[in-house]
Amino acid sequence: MTKIARVVVDVTGVDKPFDYSIPDHLADDLVVGSRVRVPLHRREVSGWVGSILDARHSDVELSRLLEVRKVTSVGPAPDVVELVDWAAHRWASRRRPLLVAASPDRRVPRRAAARYSSRSSGETHGPIAALIRTGGGVVQCGPASRHVEVLSAAISTGPTIVVAPTIARAGQLAAESRRLGFTTAMYPQEWTAAASGVDVVVGARSAVWASVPNLSCIVVIDEHDDSLQEERSPTWHARDVAVERARRSSVPCVLVSPVPTLSARHWAGDRVVATDDANQWPTIRIVDRTVDDRWASSLVTSPLIELLRDHGKRVVCVLNVKGRARALACNACRTVARCESCGAAVNQPDEQHVMCPRCSASRPVVCSSCGSQKMRAIRVGITRLREELEAAAGRPVQEIAPSTELLNPAASVFVGTEAVLYRVDRADVVVFLDIDAELLAPRFRASEQALDLLLHGARLVANGGELVIQTAVPHHEVLTGLAAGDLSTHVTAEIGRRERLLLPPFGALAEVSGKGAADVAAQLAESLLVQVAMGNDRALVRAESWDALSEALAAVDRPKERVRIAVDPPRA
């Protein structure tokens, strides 16, 4: 029976596959995933072979089919192409951007010889090895963990993919893997080596698409990190792709983090292992800003002044200005006003009501602690923050911006947004001047994102340093849990909030924006599978499951106007 190739063309905006006949001279070289050149509308374009079918399955008569012109390169393995099909449905996406992530960035005429070390086989022992043998799960580690035990246990099962949140982190893990004696390929730079066969393939989020012969295990490092999710549409998350790929391949998946997300915990169930260093965090000090008379107008508290005046300490001060919550507090007792449903900071649209920007719950302006009906906005006075710090410290303070390249050698106190944690290489103390801006932000993952920020600070000071957290909500379960070394109360509370609001991982969420958002929202509102809340320029779509959400989005007729669909939006 004559075979045809169903090709996904490498053309922006085109997702419909086209059928082409396979000439005899290409029959042996052309496989699912191959990069090919095909004719399309009187020109020749590149594409990927999505599937190979009998000619009788084509809607076009064989005599009318055009031929594949040539095979240009090795492409993603067939199992990766199938994974791309799943991901395109899951994130309401075209396949092209996903296939690009899974393909080499240059022509690869053929795979090379495999390079496996003798160290990649042999049974290892311990709780992590036992977890891997039973299908994988979550490994909770310490902030400064080098993940040697995880790497050794995973690679001992056979070829392994290791996904890290950043290229720099991936490079460190690759160096560690080579030090342990394993053959290692960095993805995507060493795509050919990865596809030919090595002990371990390491890379940032795109490594989850690596073609790996005889895949035996997938490890995701720092699964909590937002960098593992693509910001542009499709907003796929490497953690979720890794879990699905492991399921399809019947191999273990290991999600590693000092602060595992609810999504990871929900997937793993009771398959959670804590390493010996899991509780080895630096000293954590919670500073209650409301006990200071200047609490509403200044971030320079008395404990902070004491730290700054110790000139032997290198201090980093963090204030995330972008996207911060404008908090309200009781004018009488200073209690921060929070939503009774989801815990976010509320705002005051009029004299009689406060409203939650996260879940839209509304209630009268009454303090939940003392009954007062007067609120005040907490202003942080950031315009002269550096000058205030410098005056308090009696030594130079350098402001760090994302564009800052060189540090002032005379400075030992630094202040900036989150970028300061990446520009300064070491510190004795990291001070979060106003963690409430993250902790109470109108995003359902606010507490997880605040934990991520605190973790970056913990890694900067390591075990011998100190983490100082200034807050107006000192009894928040995230802060009390961190101080006590036990986040179980926070996890329980967060599970309850998300279950009530049908938020991931107990439901599915998408954000529709752009000029055509109203049209798409109107179509979705007619579906029994989803709930739609339309705002000024965007719509939030909720469903009981990812399958229900995907089915509803797939049934929408896309309007001509621009529409962006972000499934599982990172900042909703």
What is each residue range found by the language model?
Residues 206-208, 224-225, 321-324, 419-421, ...:
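Short glycine-rich anion-binding loops that position phosphate/pyrophosphate groups of nucleotides
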Residues 1-290, 306-310, 315, 333, ...:
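Accessory, non-ATPase domains that flank or precede helicase/AAA+ motor cores in DNA-metabolism machines
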Residues 27-30, 46, 77-81, 170, ...:
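Amphipathic alpha-helical transducer elements in NTP-driven molecular machines
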